[in-house]
C-alpha cells in the first residue's frame, strides 16, 4: 500500500484561507490517480475524528464534495498531547509501525519542516509546501516519484 500523510493547511489551501482550494484538490487527485495511494490525515483536522465530531467516512464525504476522487482517506494519526511530546514525524512513524498492511512507499505533504517538533525522524520523505502557496505541480511530481520509487529501506 502507498500512503500520503496529508496536512491540509498550507497544502490544500494557504494559511490566509481556511477553505480547501479546488485547484489543490485537482493536484492531489493527480497523485492519487497516478499512484493508487491512500491518505492518512496528519492535519489538525484529525482532532474532529478523535473528539467524535466527525468520522473517517464523514471526512471522505467532505473531501468528495470538494472534488477528491475515490474516497481515499483511510485513517488519521494519533492526537498529540502535552504529555506525549511527540513530533508529527514521530506520530507518523508510530502509525507506520502499527499498520497491519504492508507499506510499499509513503510521502508526507506538509508545510512543516523536519525540525524536532516538525517531521523528524521521517523528514527525508517530506515534500514541503510553501504555506502561502500550497501544493504545486512540481511538488506533485516529486510526491509521485517518492511513491513510485521509494527511498529504501523504509523506516519501519
Predicted stretch roles:
Residues 2-83:
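Alpha-helical substrate-recognition element adjacent to the catalytic core
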Residues 58, 62-156:
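C-terminal cap/substrate-recognition subdomain and adjoining C-terminal extension
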Residues 1-3, 104-105:
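Hydrophobic/aromatic side chains embedded in well-ordered alpha-helices
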Amino acid at each position: 500500500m502507498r500512503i500520503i500523510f496529508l496536512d491540509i493547511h498550507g497544502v490544500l489551501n494557504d494559511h490566509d484561507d481556511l477553505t480547501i482550494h479546488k485547484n489543490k484538490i485537482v493536484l492531489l487527485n493527480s497523485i492519487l490517480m497516478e499512484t493508487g495511494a491512500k491518505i492518512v490525515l496528519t492535519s489538525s483536522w484529525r482532532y474532529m475524528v478523535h473528539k467524535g465530531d466527525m468520522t473517517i467516512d464523514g471526512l471522505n464525504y467532505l473531501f468528495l464534495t470538494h472534488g477528491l476522487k475515490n474516497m481515499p482517506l483511510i485513517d488519521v494519526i494519533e492526537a498529540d498531547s502535552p504529555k506525549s511530546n511527540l513530533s508529527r514525524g514521530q506520530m507518523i512513524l508510530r502509525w507506520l509501525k502499527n499498520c497491519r498492511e504492508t507499506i510499499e512507499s509513503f510521502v508526507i505533504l506538509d508545510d512543516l519542516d523536519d525540525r524536532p517538533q516538525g517531521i523528524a525522524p521521517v523528514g527525508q520523505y517530506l515534500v514541503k509546501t510553501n504555506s502561502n502557496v500550497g501544493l504545486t505541480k512540481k511538488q506533485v511530481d516529486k510526491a509521485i516519484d517518492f511513491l513510485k520509487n521509494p527511498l529504501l529501506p523504509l523506516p519501519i
